[in-house]
Amino acid sequence: MVYLKNILIFLIIFLINPLVKKNKKSTKENDLKGPIALPIIGNLFGLRNDTYSIMDFYHKMYGGIYRLWFGDYFVVSLNDPEIIREIFIKNYSNFSSRPFLPTITFGSFNYRGISGSNGDYWKRNRNLLLNAMKKSNLKQTYDNLSDSVNSLINLMKEFQSSNESFQPDMYLRKYALTTMFKYVFNETVSFENKIVQGEEAELIDNINEAFNFMTLGNAGDFFKILQPLYYQYLLYRGGCFNRIRTLIRNRYIEHRKTIDIENPRDLLDLLIIEYGDHSDENMISIVQVCFDVILAGVDTLASSLEWFLVMLCNNQQIQDTVYNELKETVVGPVVTLNDRPSTPYTMACIKETIRLKAPAPFGLPHTTDQDIIVKGHFIPKDSMVLINFYSLGRNPKDFPDPLKFDPNRFIGSTPDSFMPFGTGPRNCIGQALGMDQIYLLLSNIFLNFKITSENGKKLDDTDYVSGLNLKPAKYKVCLEKR
Protein backbone atom coordinates (compact mmCIF):
# COMPACT_ATOMS: atom_id res chain seq x y z
CA MET A 1 0.00 0.00 0.00
CA VAL A 2 2.83 2.39 0.93
CA TYR A 3 4.54 1.40 -2.31
CA LEU A 4 1.46 2.33 -4.37
CA LYS A 5 1.06 5.56 -2.41
CA ASN A 6 4.66 6.56 -3.19
CA ILE A 7 4.14 5.80 -6.88
CA LEU A 8 0.99 7.93 -6.88
CA ILE A 9 2.81 10.83 -5.21
CA PHE A 10 5.64 10.52 -7.73
CA LEU A 11 3.21 10.57 -10.66
CA ILE A 12 1.41 13.62 -9.28
CA ILE A 13 4.70 15.49 -8.86
CA PHE A 14 5.84 14.29 -12.29
CA LEU A 15 2.72 15.76 -13.89
CA ILE A 16 2.26 18.86 -11.75
CA ASN A 17 5.85 20.09 -12.05
CA PRO A 18 5.84 20.57 -15.86
CA LEU A 19 2.28 21.90 -15.70
CA VAL A 20 3.37 24.64 -13.29
CA LYS A 21 6.63 25.30 -15.13
CA LYS A 22 4.99 25.74 -18.53
CA ASN A 23 2.06 27.85 -17.32
CA LYS A 24 3.45 29.91 -14.45
CA LYS A 25 2.55 33.58 -14.56
CA SER A 26 5.52 35.90 -14.79
CA THR A 27 5.69 39.35 -13.28
CA LYS A 28 7.40 40.60 -16.45
CA GLU A 29 5.06 42.66 -18.60
CA ASN A 30 6.87 41.68 -21.79
CA ASP A 31 6.53 37.91 -21.38
CA LEU A 32 4.63 36.25 -24.21
CA LYS A 33 1.07 35.08 -23.79
CA GLY A 34 -0.26 31.78 -25.06
CA PRO A 35 -2.65 28.88 -24.45
CA ILE A 36 -2.49 26.66 -21.37
CA ALA A 37 0.08 23.92 -21.88
CA LEU A 38 -0.70 20.38 -20.73
CA PRO A 39 1.79 18.40 -18.64
CA ILE A 40 4.57 16.78 -20.67
CA ILE A 41 3.04 17.26 -24.16
CA GLY A 42 2.44 21.00 -23.82
CA ASN A 43 0.35 22.22 -26.78
CA LEU A 44 1.16 19.37 -29.16
CA PHE A 45 -2.23 17.70 -28.77
CA GLY A 46 -4.07 17.78 -32.09
CA LEU A 47 -1.41 19.76 -33.92
CA ARG A 48 -0.22 16.99 -36.22
CA ASN A 49 -3.64 16.54 -37.84
CA ASP A 50 -4.97 20.10 -37.70
CA THR A 51 -1.87 22.27 -37.37
CA TYR A 52 -2.83 25.25 -39.47
CA SER A 53 -6.35 25.92 -38.21
CA ILE A 54 -5.28 25.50 -34.56
CA MET A 55 -2.34 27.88 -34.98
CA ASP A 56 -4.61 30.35 -36.78
CA PHE A 57 -7.09 30.13 -33.89
CA TYR A 58 -4.28 30.97 -31.44
CA HIS A 59 -3.31 33.90 -33.66
CA LYS A 60 -6.83 35.30 -33.36
CA MET A 61 -6.71 34.86 -29.57
CA TYR A 62 -3.20 36.08 -28.76
CA GLY A 63 -2.27 38.39 -31.62
CA GLY A 64 0.85 38.88 -33.70
CA ILE A 65 3.22 36.93 -31.44
CA TYR A 66 2.46 34.22 -28.90
CA ARG A 67 4.11 31.29 -27.15
CA LEU A 68 3.45 27.55 -27.13
CA TRP A 69 5.08 24.46 -25.71
CA PHE A 70 5.89 21.64 -28.12
CA GLY A 71 6.84 18.93 -25.65
CA ASP A 72 10.14 20.12 -24.14
CA TYR A 73 10.48 23.12 -26.47
CA PHE A 74 9.37 26.70 -25.90
CA VAL A 75 7.95 27.83 -29.24
CA VAL A 76 7.28 31.36 -30.49
CA SER A 77 4.80 31.84 -33.35
CA LEU A 78 5.19 35.02 -35.40
CA ASN A 79 2.11 36.38 -37.18
CA ASP A 80 2.86 40.10 -37.46
CA PRO A 81 4.84 41.46 -40.46
CA GLU A 82 6.51 44.24 -38.46
CA ILE A 83 7.73 41.82 -35.80
CA ILE A 84 8.89 39.35 -38.46
CA ARG A 85 10.96 42.01 -40.23
CA GLU A 86 12.35 43.28 -36.93
CA ILE A 87 13.51 39.76 -36.14
CA PHE A 88 14.75 38.45 -39.49
CA ILE A 89 16.17 41.66 -40.95
CA LYS A 90 17.35 43.83 -38.03
CA ASN A 91 18.19 40.95 -35.66
CA TYR A 92 18.71 38.07 -38.09
CA SER A 93 22.06 37.00 -36.58
CA ASN A 94 20.27 36.03 -33.35
CA PHE A 95 17.58 34.05 -35.21
CA SER A 96 19.42 32.53 -38.18
CA SER A 97 20.14 29.10 -36.66
CA ARG A 98 18.05 25.95 -37.00
CA PRO A 99 17.11 23.99 -33.85
CA PHE A 100 18.68 20.60 -33.26
CA LEU A 101 15.81 18.23 -34.04
CA PRO A 102 16.07 14.68 -35.43
CA THR A 103 14.04 15.54 -38.53
CA ILE A 104 16.25 18.50 -39.44
CA THR A 105 19.41 16.57 -38.53
CA PHE A 106 18.44 13.72 -40.82
CA GLY A 107 16.93 15.84 -43.59
CA SER A 108 19.99 18.09 -43.78
CA PHE A 109 22.49 15.22 -43.54
CA ASN A 110 23.71 16.44 -40.15
CA TYR A 111 23.19 20.19 -40.76
CA ARG A 112 24.82 20.46 -44.14
CA GLY A 113 23.59 22.15 -47.32
CA ILE A 114 21.69 25.42 -47.39
CA SER A 115 18.28 24.87 -45.74
CA GLY A 116 19.32 23.15 -42.52
CA SER A 117 22.89 24.32 -41.86
CA ASN A 118 23.94 26.90 -39.27
CA GLY A 119 26.51 29.60 -38.54
CA ASP A 120 29.60 30.08 -40.70
CA TYR A 121 28.95 26.78 -42.47
CA TRP A 122 25.57 28.08 -43.67
CA LYS A 123 27.06 31.44 -44.70
CA ARG A 124 29.75 29.70 -46.75
CA ASN A 125 27.26 27.41 -48.47
CA ARG A 126 24.86 30.27 -49.20
CA ASN A 127 27.60 32.51 -50.61
CA LEU A 128 29.00 29.74 -52.82
CA LEU A 129 25.51 28.87 -54.06
CA LEU A 130 24.71 32.52 -54.80
CA ASN A 131 28.00 32.88 -56.71
CA ALA A 132 27.18 29.77 -58.74
CA MET A 133 23.64 30.97 -59.46
CA LYS A 134 24.91 34.34 -60.69
CA LYS A 135 27.16 32.57 -63.20
CA SER A 136 24.59 30.02 -64.35
CA ASN A 137 23.32 29.95 -67.92
CA LEU A 138 19.85 31.38 -67.40
CA LYS A 139 19.13 31.53 -71.13
CA GLN A 140 19.57 27.77 -71.31
CA THR A 141 17.31 27.32 -68.29
CA TYR A 142 14.59 29.61 -69.63
CA ASP A 143 14.72 28.10 -73.12
CA ASN A 144 14.11 24.72 -71.50
CA LEU A 145 11.37 26.24 -69.34
CA SER A 146 9.55 27.46 -72.45
CA ASP A 147 9.93 24.03 -74.05
CA SER A 148 8.51 22.38 -70.92
CA VAL A 149 5.51 24.71 -70.94
CA ASN A 150 4.82 23.96 -74.60
CA SER A 151 5.25 20.22 -74.06
CA LEU A 152 2.80 20.14 -71.15
CA ILE A 153 0.28 22.27 -73.04
CA ASN A 154 0.50 19.86 -76.00
CA LEU A 155 0.03 16.91 -73.65
CA MET A 156 -3.05 18.59 -72.16
CA LYS A 157 -4.38 19.09 -75.70
CA GLU A 158 -4.22 15.31 -76.15
CA PHE A 159 -6.38 14.87 -73.05
CA GLN A 160 -8.76 17.57 -74.32
CA SER A 161 -9.11 16.16 -77.82
CA SER A 162 -9.83 12.65 -76.50
CA ASN A 163 -12.27 13.98 -73.84
CA GLU A 164 -10.20 12.40 -71.06
CA SER A 165 -10.26 13.85 -67.57
CA PHE A 166 -6.96 15.39 -66.55
CA GLN A 167 -5.41 14.69 -63.12
CA PRO A 168 -2.73 17.36 -62.84
CA ASP A 169 -0.68 16.51 -59.74
CA MET A 170 2.02 14.27 -61.24
CA TYR A 171 2.27 16.33 -64.43
CA LEU A 172 2.74 19.56 -62.48
CA ARG A 173 5.45 17.93 -60.39
CA LYS A 174 7.12 16.66 -63.54
CA TYR A 175 6.97 20.18 -64.98
CA ALA A 176 8.72 21.54 -61.89
CA LEU A 177 11.22 18.69 -62.07
CA THR A 178 12.12 19.41 -65.72
CA THR A 179 13.29 22.91 -64.82
CA MET A 180 15.31 21.69 -61.85
CA PHE A 181 16.97 18.91 -63.86
CA LYS A 182 17.98 21.31 -66.62
CA TYR A 183 19.15 23.97 -64.17
CA VAL A 184 21.07 21.66 -61.84
CA PHE A 185 22.19 18.77 -64.10
CA ASN A 186 21.70 20.08 -67.68
CA GLU A 187 19.38 17.13 -68.31
CA THR A 188 16.17 17.24 -70.34
CA VAL A 189 13.09 15.42 -69.05
CA SER A 190 10.65 14.41 -71.78
CA PHE A 191 6.88 15.00 -71.75
CA GLU A 192 6.23 12.52 -74.55
CA ASN A 193 4.24 10.02 -72.50
CA LYS A 194 0.89 10.58 -70.82
CA ILE A 195 2.01 8.37 -67.94
CA VAL A 196 4.67 9.70 -65.57
CA GLN A 197 6.87 6.69 -64.91
CA GLY A 198 10.43 5.47 -64.42
CA GLU A 199 13.09 7.54 -62.67
CA GLU A 200 11.00 10.73 -62.78
CA ALA A 201 8.01 9.11 -61.05
CA GLU A 202 10.26 7.50 -58.44
CA LEU A 203 12.01 10.79 -57.71
CA ILE A 204 8.70 12.67 -57.43
CA ASP A 205 7.43 10.03 -54.97
CA ASN A 206 10.64 10.26 -52.93
CA ILE A 207 10.42 14.06 -52.78
CA ASN A 208 6.80 13.85 -51.65
CA GLU A 209 7.69 11.27 -49.00
CA ALA A 210 10.60 13.41 -47.77
CA PHE A 211 8.28 16.40 -47.30
CA ASN A 212 5.83 14.23 -45.37
CA PHE A 213 8.57 13.36 -42.88
CA MET A 214 9.00 17.08 -42.16
CA THR A 215 5.51 17.49 -40.67
CA LEU A 216 5.32 19.92 -37.77
CA GLY A 217 4.26 18.17 -34.57
CA ASN A 218 6.28 14.94 -34.69
CA ALA A 219 6.50 13.78 -31.07
CA GLY A 220 9.95 12.31 -31.71
CA ASP A 221 11.28 15.77 -32.50
CA PHE A 222 10.04 17.54 -29.40
CA PHE A 223 10.64 15.11 -26.52
CA LYS A 224 14.35 14.94 -25.84
CA ILE A 225 14.09 11.48 -24.31
CA LEU A 226 12.60 10.19 -27.59
CA GLN A 227 14.97 11.95 -29.97
CA PRO A 228 17.65 9.22 -30.19
CA LEU A 229 14.96 6.60 -30.90
CA TYR A 230 13.25 8.81 -33.45
CA TYR A 231 16.53 9.43 -35.26
CA GLN A 232 17.02 5.66 -35.52
CA TYR A 233 13.48 5.40 -36.86
CA LEU A 234 14.34 7.97 -39.54
CA LEU A 235 17.44 5.99 -40.46
CA TYR A 236 15.25 2.91 -40.85
CA ARG A 237 12.22 4.46 -42.59
CA GLY A 238 13.63 7.56 -44.24
CA GLY A 239 15.15 5.86 -47.27
CA CYS A 240 13.58 8.49 -49.54
CA PHE A 241 16.18 11.03 -48.40
CA ASN A 242 19.07 8.72 -49.21
CA ARG A 243 17.59 7.69 -52.57
CA ILE A 244 17.43 11.34 -53.63
CA ARG A 245 20.98 11.95 -52.41
CA THR A 246 22.23 8.86 -54.24
CA LEU A 247 20.73 10.13 -57.49
CA ILE A 248 22.48 13.47 -57.00
CA ARG A 249 25.76 11.87 -55.89
CA ASN A 250 25.89 9.73 -59.03
CA ARG A 251 25.52 12.84 -61.15
CA TYR A 252 28.18 14.61 -59.08
CA ILE A 253 30.65 11.78 -59.79
CA GLU A 254 29.85 11.89 -63.51
CA HIS A 255 30.21 15.69 -63.58
CA ARG A 256 33.59 15.46 -61.85
CA LYS A 257 34.81 13.15 -64.62
CA THR A 258 33.56 15.27 -67.51
CA ILE A 259 33.72 18.87 -66.25
CA ASP A 260 35.28 21.62 -68.36
CA ILE A 261 35.94 24.49 -65.95
CA GLU A 262 36.08 26.95 -68.85
CA ASN A 263 32.62 25.90 -70.03
CA PRO A 264 30.42 24.93 -67.07
CA ARG A 265 27.22 23.21 -68.17
CA ASP A 266 24.94 23.73 -65.19
CA LEU A 267 24.62 24.59 -61.52
CA LEU A 268 26.35 21.39 -60.43
CA ASP A 269 29.44 22.22 -62.52
CA LEU A 270 29.48 25.73 -61.10
CA LEU A 271 29.22 24.44 -57.52
CA ILE A 272 32.13 22.05 -58.11
CA ILE A 273 34.19 25.00 -59.38
CA GLU A 274 33.13 27.32 -56.53
CA TYR A 275 33.90 24.80 -53.78
CA GLY A 276 37.39 24.23 -55.17
CA ASP A 277 39.10 21.16 -53.74
CA HIS A 278 37.39 17.81 -54.17
CA SER A 279 37.36 16.70 -50.54
CA ASP A 280 34.72 14.30 -49.27
CA GLU A 281 33.26 17.06 -47.11
CA ASN A 282 32.88 19.38 -50.09
CA MET A 283 31.25 16.58 -52.06
CA ILE A 284 28.73 16.01 -49.26
CA SER A 285 28.04 19.75 -49.05
CA ILE A 286 27.47 20.06 -52.81
CA VAL A 287 25.16 17.04 -52.86
CA GLN A 288 23.13 18.44 -49.97
CA VAL A 289 22.93 21.91 -51.54
CA CYS A 290 21.56 20.33 -54.74
CA PHE A 291 19.19 18.23 -52.61
CA ASP A 292 17.82 21.40 -50.97
CA VAL A 293 17.49 23.25 -54.29
CA ILE A 294 15.61 20.39 -55.95
CA LEU A 295 13.24 19.73 -53.04
CA ALA A 296 12.36 23.41 -52.68
CA GLY A 297 11.99 23.79 -56.43
CA VAL A 298 9.67 20.84 -57.03
CA ASP A 299 7.15 20.17 -54.28
CA THR A 300 6.26 23.66 -53.08
CA LEU A 301 6.04 24.99 -56.63
CA ALA A 302 3.87 22.11 -57.82
CA SER A 303 1.55 22.56 -54.84
CA SER A 304 1.03 26.23 -55.74
CA LEU A 305 0.22 25.24 -59.33
CA GLU A 306 -2.30 22.65 -58.12
CA TRP A 307 -4.01 25.18 -55.87
CA PHE A 308 -4.25 27.73 -58.68
CA LEU A 309 -6.14 25.28 -60.87
CA VAL A 310 -8.49 24.52 -57.97
CA MET A 311 -9.20 28.17 -57.22
CA LEU A 312 -9.87 29.16 -60.84
CA CYS A 313 -11.92 26.03 -61.50
CA ASN A 314 -14.09 27.00 -58.52
CA ASN A 315 -14.33 30.64 -59.62
CA GLN A 316 -15.38 30.54 -63.27
CA GLN A 317 -15.98 34.29 -63.56
CA ILE A 318 -12.43 34.99 -62.38
CA GLN A 319 -11.14 32.35 -64.80
CA ASP A 320 -12.93 34.10 -67.67
CA THR A 321 -11.45 37.45 -66.62
CA VAL A 322 -7.96 35.92 -66.71
CA TYR A 323 -8.60 34.49 -70.17
CA ASN A 324 -9.94 37.80 -71.51
CA GLU A 325 -6.92 39.69 -70.18
CA LEU A 326 -4.53 37.20 -71.77
CA LYS A 327 -6.44 37.13 -75.06
CA GLU A 328 -6.44 40.93 -75.34
CA THR A 329 -2.79 41.30 -74.35
CA VAL A 330 -0.82 38.40 -75.83
CA VAL A 331 0.21 38.94 -79.45
CA GLY A 332 1.54 35.48 -80.34
CA PRO A 333 0.25 31.94 -79.74
CA VAL A 334 2.06 31.66 -76.38
CA VAL A 335 2.44 33.84 -73.31
CA THR A 336 6.01 34.92 -72.52
CA LEU A 337 7.56 36.69 -69.55
CA ASN A 338 7.48 39.90 -71.60
CA ASP A 339 3.68 39.79 -71.29
CA ARG A 340 3.71 39.77 -67.49
CA PRO A 341 3.68 43.57 -66.94
CA SER A 342 0.61 43.79 -69.18
CA THR A 343 -1.32 41.06 -67.33
CA PRO A 344 -1.76 42.43 -63.78
CA TYR A 345 -4.97 40.49 -63.11
CA THR A 346 -3.32 37.16 -63.91
CA MET A 347 -0.46 38.02 -61.55
CA ALA A 348 -2.98 39.12 -58.91
CA CYS A 349 -4.65 35.69 -59.16
CA ILE A 350 -1.30 33.98 -58.62
CA LYS A 351 -0.55 36.11 -55.54
CA GLU A 352 -4.06 35.61 -54.18
CA THR A 353 -3.67 31.83 -54.49
CA ILE A 354 -0.34 31.93 -52.67
CA ARG A 355 -1.85 34.17 -49.97
CA LEU A 356 -4.79 31.89 -49.29
CA LYS A 357 -2.91 28.61 -49.79
CA ALA A 358 0.57 29.31 -48.42
CA PRO A 359 3.01 26.91 -50.15
CA ALA A 360 5.03 26.41 -46.95
CA PRO A 361 2.75 27.48 -44.05
CA PHE A 362 5.55 27.50 -41.44
CA GLY A 363 8.73 26.80 -43.37
CA LEU A 364 11.58 25.47 -41.27
CA PRO A 365 11.90 26.60 -37.64
CA HIS A 366 14.58 28.97 -36.36
CA THR A 367 16.10 29.19 -32.89
CA THR A 368 17.36 32.08 -30.75
CA ASP A 369 21.03 32.25 -29.79
CA GLN A 370 20.48 34.81 -26.99
CA ASP A 371 17.71 36.38 -24.91
CA ILE A 372 16.20 39.34 -26.77
CA ILE A 373 13.35 41.84 -26.55
CA VAL A 374 11.64 42.55 -29.88
CA LYS A 375 8.94 45.23 -30.13
CA GLY A 376 8.42 44.95 -26.38
CA HIS A 377 8.19 41.13 -26.37
CA PHE A 378 10.73 39.00 -24.49
CA ILE A 379 11.98 35.97 -26.42
CA PRO A 380 14.29 33.74 -24.34
CA LYS A 381 17.43 32.00 -25.55
CA ASP A 382 16.89 28.60 -27.22
CA SER A 383 13.31 29.39 -28.21
CA MET A 384 12.06 27.70 -31.36
CA VAL A 385 10.71 30.41 -33.67
CA LEU A 386 8.14 29.85 -36.45
CA ILE A 387 6.86 32.27 -39.08
CA ASN A 388 3.16 31.54 -39.43
CA PHE A 389 2.74 32.30 -43.14
CA TYR A 390 -0.67 30.65 -43.06
CA SER A 391 -2.07 33.18 -40.57
CA LEU A 392 -0.20 36.08 -42.17
CA GLY A 393 -2.22 35.56 -45.33
CA ARG A 394 -5.51 35.26 -43.43
CA ASN A 395 -5.28 38.26 -41.15
CA PRO A 396 -8.50 40.29 -41.64
CA LYS A 397 -6.58 43.43 -40.68
CA ASP A 398 -4.58 43.19 -43.91
CA PHE A 399 -6.99 41.06 -45.96
CA PRO A 400 -10.68 41.81 -45.26
CA ASP A 401 -12.91 38.75 -45.64
CA PRO A 402 -9.72 36.64 -45.79
CA LEU A 403 -11.32 33.34 -46.80
CA LYS A 404 -12.76 34.86 -49.97
CA PHE A 405 -10.73 34.36 -53.15
CA ASP A 406 -10.41 37.96 -54.38
CA PRO A 407 -7.51 38.79 -56.75
CA ASN A 408 -8.43 42.50 -56.63
CA ARG A 409 -6.54 42.67 -53.32
CA PHE A 410 -3.33 42.65 -55.35
CA ILE A 411 -4.28 45.13 -58.07
CA GLY A 412 -2.14 48.24 -57.67
CA SER A 413 -0.12 47.33 -54.59
CA THR A 414 0.98 44.35 -52.51
CA PRO A 415 0.31 44.38 -48.73
CA ASP A 416 3.40 44.31 -46.48
CA SER A 417 2.19 41.09 -44.89
CA PHE A 418 2.53 39.21 -48.19
CA MET A 419 5.87 37.45 -47.74
CA PRO A 420 5.36 33.81 -48.83
CA PHE A 421 9.07 33.27 -49.51
CA GLY A 422 10.24 34.60 -46.16
CA THR A 423 12.35 37.66 -45.47
CA GLY A 424 15.93 38.42 -44.49
CA PRO A 425 19.08 36.45 -45.38
CA ARG A 426 17.39 33.05 -44.98
CA ASN A 427 14.58 33.76 -47.42
CA CYS A 428 14.02 31.60 -50.50
CA ILE A 429 16.83 32.41 -52.94
CA GLY A 430 15.04 30.75 -55.85
CA GLN A 431 11.81 32.76 -55.62
CA ALA A 432 12.34 34.70 -58.88
CA LEU A 433 12.73 31.53 -60.95
CA GLY A 434 9.81 29.94 -59.10
CA MET A 435 7.45 32.83 -59.86
CA ASP A 436 8.54 32.77 -63.52
CA GLN A 437 7.74 29.05 -63.71
CA ILE A 438 4.32 29.62 -62.18
CA TYR A 439 3.42 32.55 -64.44
CA LEU A 440 4.55 30.95 -67.68
CA LEU A 441 2.68 27.69 -67.17
CA LEU A 442 -0.54 29.00 -65.68
CA SER A 443 -0.96 31.86 -68.14
CA ASN A 444 -0.50 29.48 -71.07
CA ILE A 445 -2.89 26.91 -69.58
CA PHE A 446 -5.69 29.46 -69.23
CA LEU A 447 -4.99 30.98 -72.63
CA ASN A 448 -5.62 27.55 -74.16
CA PHE A 449 -8.21 25.88 -71.93
CA LYS A 450 -11.36 26.45 -69.96
CA ILE A 451 -11.10 24.24 -66.89
CA THR A 452 -14.14 22.76 -65.15
CA SER A 453 -14.78 19.97 -62.66
CA GLU A 454 -15.98 16.56 -63.82
CA ASN A 455 -19.39 16.79 -62.16
CA GLY A 456 -20.02 20.52 -62.42
CA LYS A 457 -19.57 20.96 -58.67
CA LYS A 458 -16.75 22.83 -56.98
CA LEU A 459 -13.52 20.98 -56.30
CA ASP A 460 -12.57 20.23 -52.71
CA ASP A 461 -10.46 23.17 -51.55
CA THR A 462 -9.92 21.83 -48.03
CA ASP A 463 -6.44 22.42 -46.65
CA TYR A 464 -4.58 19.13 -46.38
CA VAL A 465 -1.48 18.80 -44.26
CA SER A 466 1.38 17.23 -46.17
CA GLY A 467 4.64 17.67 -44.31
CA LEU A 468 5.96 21.17 -44.85
CA ASN A 469 3.42 21.85 -47.58
CA LEU A 470 -0.25 22.63 -47.89
CA LYS A 471 -1.72 20.50 -50.68
CA PRO A 472 -5.18 19.91 -52.11
CA ALA A 473 -6.74 16.49 -52.34
CA LYS A 474 -6.12 14.74 -55.64
CA TYR A 475 -8.61 15.84 -58.25
CA LYS A 476 -9.45 15.60 -61.96
CA VAL A 477 -10.66 18.35 -64.27
CA CYS A 478 -12.17 18.62 -67.74
CA LEU A 479 -10.31 20.61 -70.39
CA GLU A 480 -12.27 22.61 -72.95
CA LYS A 481 -10.48 24.26 -75.86
CA ARG A 482 -10.60 28.05 -75.85
UniProtKB/Swiss-Prot annotation:
Protein location: Membrane
Main subcellular localisation: membrane
CDD domains on file: CYP1_2-like
Membrane topology: Single-pass membrane protein
Source organism, top-level taxon: Eukaryota
Cofactors required: heme
Keyword terms of this UniProt record: Heme, Iron, Membrane, Metal-binding, Monooxygenase, Oxidoreductase, Transmembrane, Transmembrane helix
Residues that span the membrane, as ranges: 1-21
Pfam families listed in its UniProt record: p450
Entries under InterPro entries matching the protein: Cyt_P450, Cyt_P450_CS, Cyt_P450_E_grp-I, Cyt_P450_sf
Assigned EC number: 1.14.-.-
MF (Gene Ontology): heme binding; iron ion binding; monooxygenase activity; oxidoreductase activity, acting on paired donors, with incorporation or reduction of molecular oxygen
GO cellular component, one term: membrane
Record: residues binding heme: 428
Family per record: Belongs to the cytochrome P450 family.
Protein name: Probable cytochrome P450 508D1
Organism name: Dictyostelium discoideum
